[in-house]
Each structure stands twice: as structure tokens, then as C-alpha cells.
């Protein structure tokens, strides 16, 4: 979930004028690309010494099992699938957190939330000031950096030259909280920026945040009805639901929707995925027309997944840490640098994205990151065993949540997951709840087998408790208050109001 918007609105005309001026300046000065790394040209640079462009495509709330490249039968993702055919799929990629405000900082800093410190909506995003980011490393090595984030501000704007969060800003500068987001607008802005810098010899880093699959499910025609055109029931599953069940009751299965209604909601979700995919296709087509495809590394991932009824958790994320929430797509396409059409089974983590992209750019990976480069794993080189993935839950918005026993950071669900096993810690007084799943035998996480694998339980428990012990907020049972504008934004996305937590 986005935090309160504190970034000054930057009109697109100003963005393009600044970009054009920068391009002209570098051309006039004859600026070329710096040599990479401490020892000259690095592995990520091509024959000309030019580092690759880097395009980070993040789709809010995108489940990997709803993509065609991972076996989904509906045609939700032809453009993402095309990228997957040219790249590497990390089949078991795990997010560091189940909510946006924690997850994106982990992607761009390469560390888990207990280290970067942003744990709840409402926190001052200045907590990230001074934290090394992917953007900072790339800019220090000759990259231009632009982000189109659709209202997101979690303190990551500081290192971008141009950062456009303005999709929620109206024509008169007022804040507009609207239930539908148009991912096409995001691609249009990015394409305009890319065209404005044609001829600029510097590589670009472009971060795109698409967020159509996030509730409320309200894709424009034809996507909204693409996968269930015959539906004739009462629900639209967007901001105008009629009848409107209490959101908290619906999320946690207390208001039981008939199976046909759930099917329709999933069809709406799939339509949103297809809408985001088309926006990605528009951007990739433009990059290809500019002749930049062969010079561009592309990553497709998500901040978290979405519950679609598993574990009685409907159309939401962040409260629990089961596979539909923590498992995300991770596709890396790197022409000439990584194999094509390869699927990797060992666990990967979203905190691995930063060091992986730095490595692919031919830049030495900084020390102090918890993530590690996935390049050796993708190339089939000896990489050592994959470290287990940590994840944590987000802020509890709904009093109806039957499995949130303690508020604040102290009450966060926490998880460690390796290639086969998952251990979940659920804080509760006087004793916590522990759940342990053998994902190879039970991918749906239906049987707690904590008594059957004592050695694996001990191994993952030791790793998890070490993280808890080092967490400065581990005993904090308070949550920061929500500013009025943030609360209004959260209300538009279904997190507060209508019988839910204030």
C-alpha cells in the first residue's frame, strides 16, 4: 500500500523538457559510458563498453500462477510470456513482505524490512534517507533514472532524477483518490520520457509500477468482462459493489460468497492482469521501435501476491504469509548476458533483485546487502545453496481478522522458506503459534507437519529467531497513526471504512 504522498507534482511537460536538456548536454559534451568496476570494463558491458539499460517492471498484487508462462490456462499475459521466453523464470521467488510499503523498499535496497526499517503505512518515509538503493548505485555509474509509480511514495524518490507519482493528482493540483488506475497512462509517460532522450549515450534505469490487479478490480473494457462475459450476478467487485458486504467480513470468509461469485471475482482479477500486461506490451513495443531491446535488461516482478479464497482469505494480501501472498513472479531477460527460456527451481528472493541488476550492469555489488546476485544461478554456475527467504506480514487494517492477536511490529507474522519447507511464526500471548509445511507434498499448505521434521524445523526456526532478535521493533505493539490524506487513499482501495478498522 502506498504511503502519504509527499512528492511535489511534476508535470509531464517539465519532465520531458528536463530530459531533453540533459540529453542535449551529454551529446554536446561527448559524454560516453564509464568503464565498469574497479578493473575496467565489467561483464555487464557490451563490446562498445556501454552498460545495458535496466527496466524494472513491477505489477502490484500479481500472482505468478496467473501467468501463462507458468501454466495458467487463461490468456492473461502474452507480453510477459514473451519476455519469459527470452529470459529466465525463477519459479519460487518470495517477497520480503506482504504489503507494498515494506516490499518495494526491500526490492530497491536489497535488505529485509527489519533492516531498512519501513514496517507500516503511516511511518515517516524519511527513515530510508541515507539507505543505499539500486537507483543510487546505477546513477553513480552513469545511468539516467526515471520512475513512474502511480501514487506510490515510500521514500524511494530521493535517488531518481525524475520521479512521477502524479496519477492521483487532479488538473488543479488537488489530490484525487479514484478506485481505478490506468496502467496505460503509466506506459504513455514512460514512452514519452524515452523518446525525449533518444540519442543520449547514457543508459537508462526505468522503474515502472503498474497496479491494476490491486483491489478494487475495475479494469476498463474490454478487460473487465474478458474472462466471464456471461456473468449475470449482483457483484462488480470494484468500488461500486452492489450489494456491498462488509469488506472485512468478506476478506476473512465470514460473509460467504457463493462459488460462482468468487469465480467472477477471479475473472475480474485476471482481467486486471491482462490490462497491466497490455500496458507492458505497449512499453516493450516502443522500446523495440527505438532499437533498444537488445541493450535492455528487463525484470518482471511484484511486491506481493493476492489471496483469492485460499485459507479463507479473499481479495486481499498482507495479513497472512501463505503461498498466494508471498510468492511472486520473477522473470529476468538479459540479452547476451543470461540464457533464454530457462526455469530455475531453487528459492529466489526479491531482495536478490538489486544485486542481480547491479551485477548484470557490470558494477561491483556493494557490501552490506542481504540479497545476493542470481546471475551465477541463472548461468548454471556453482552458487552454493540458496539461502532461505524471510517474509513478514503488514499492518492489520481489519478487526475481523481472526488470526491477528497482537498489534504493531510485535504482532507481525514472520516466515522462513527454503526450496521445500516453510516455517511460519504467529505471535500470540502467552505462547506463539508455529506452523510448518512440506510444500513438496502439500503445496496448498493444508497440513501443519511441525512434529515430523524436527531437524528442518530447528534449522528454519534458528534462522527466523535470529532475525527477530535483531529487529529493533520486535517489542513494539503500537502502529503509527494514519494522516488524513493517507486514510482517504486507503479508503479508496478498500482498507478502511465500511465496518473495518478505523
Tell me what each language-model feature is:
Residues 3-17:
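N-terminal Sec-pathway targeting helices
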Residues 1-2, 496:
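Accessible peptide chain termini
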Amino acid at each position: 500500500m502506498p504511503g502519504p504522498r509527499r512528492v511535489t507534482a511534476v508535470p509531464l511537460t517539465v519532465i520531458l523538457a528536463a530530459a531533453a536538456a540533459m540529453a542535449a548536454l551529454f551529446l554536446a559534451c561527448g559524454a560516453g559510458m564509464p568503464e565498469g568496476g574497479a578493473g575496467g570494463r565489467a561483464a555487464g558491458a557490451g563490446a562498445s563498453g556501454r552498460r545495458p539499460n535496466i527496466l524494472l517492471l513491477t505489477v502490484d498484487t500479481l500472482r505468478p500462477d496467473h501467468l501463462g508462462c507458468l501454466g495458467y490456462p487463461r490468456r492473461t499475459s502474452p507480453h510477459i510470456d514473451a519476455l519469459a521466453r527470452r529470459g529466465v523464470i525463477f519459479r519460487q521467488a518470495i517477497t520480503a513482505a506482504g504489503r507494498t510499503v515494506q516490499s518495494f523498499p526491500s526490492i530497491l535496497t536489497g535488505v529485509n524490512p527489519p533492516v531498512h526499517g519501513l514496517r507500516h503505512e503511516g511511518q515517516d518515509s524519511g527513515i530510508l534517507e541515507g539507505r543505499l538503493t539500486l537507483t543510487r548505485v546505477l546513477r553513480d555509474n552513469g545511468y539516467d533514472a526515471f520512475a513512474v509509480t502511480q501514487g506510490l511514495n515510500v521514500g524511494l524518490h530521493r535517488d531518481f532524477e525524475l520521479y512521477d507519482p502524479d496519477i492521483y493528482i487532479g488538473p488543479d493540483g488537488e489530490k484525487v483518490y479514484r478506485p481505478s488506475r490506468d496502467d496505460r497512462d503509466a506506459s504513455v509517460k514512460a514512452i514519452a520520457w524515452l523518446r525525449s532522450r533518444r540519442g543520449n549515450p547514457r543508459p537508462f534505469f526505468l522503474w515502472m509500477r503498474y497496479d491494476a490487479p490491486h483491489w478494487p478490480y475495475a479494469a476498463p473494457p474490454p478487460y473487465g468482462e474478458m474472462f466471464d462475459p456471461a456473468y449475470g450476478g449482483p457483484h462488480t467487485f470494484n468500488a461500486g459493489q452492489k450489494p456491498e458486504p462488509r469488506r472485512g467480513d468478506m476478506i476473512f470468509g465470514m460473509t460467504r460468497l457463493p462459488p460462482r461469485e468468487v469465480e467472477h471475482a477471479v475473472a475480474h482479477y485476471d482481467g486486471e492482469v491482462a490490462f497491466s500486461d497490455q500496458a507492458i506490451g505497449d512499453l516493450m513495443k516502443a522500446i523495440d521501435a527505438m532499437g533498444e531491446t537488445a541493450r535492455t535488461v528487463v525484470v518482471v516482478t511484484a511486491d506481493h501476491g493476492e489471496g483469492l479464497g485460499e485459507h479463507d482469505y479473499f481479495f486481499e494480501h498482507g495479513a497472512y504469509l501463505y503461498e498466494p501472498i508471498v510468492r511472486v513472479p520473477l522473470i529476468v531477460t538479459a540479452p547476451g548476458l543470461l540464457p533464454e527460456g530457462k526455469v530455475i527451481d531453487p528459492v529466489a528472493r526479491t531482495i536478490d533483485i538489486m544485486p542481480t541488476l547491479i551485477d548484470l550492469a557490470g558494477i561491483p555489488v556493494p557490501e552490506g546487502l542481504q540479497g545476493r546476485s542470481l546471475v551465477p544461478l541463472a548461468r548454471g554456475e556453482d552458487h552454493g545453496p540458496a539461502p532461505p527467504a524471510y517474509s513478514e506480514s503488514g499492518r492489520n487494517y481489519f478487526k475481523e481478522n481472526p488470526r491477528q492477536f497482537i498489534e504493531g511490529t510485535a504482532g507481525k507474522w514472520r516466515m522462513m522458506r527454503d526450496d521445500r519447507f516453510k516455517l511460519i511464526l504467529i505471535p500470540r500471548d502467552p505462547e506463539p503459534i508455529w506452523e510448518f509445511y512440506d510444500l513438496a507434498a502439500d503445496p496448498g499448505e493444508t497440513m501443519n507437519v511441525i512434529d515430523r521434521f524436527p531437524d528442518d524445523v530447528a534449522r528454519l526456526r534458528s534462522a527466523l529467531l535470529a532475525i527477530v532478535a535483531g529487529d529493533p521493533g520486535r517489542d513494539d505493539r503500537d502502529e503509527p497513526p494514519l494522516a488524513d490524506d493517507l486514510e482517504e487513499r486507503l479508503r479508496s482501495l478498500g482498507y478502511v471504512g465500511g465496518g473495518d478498522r478505523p
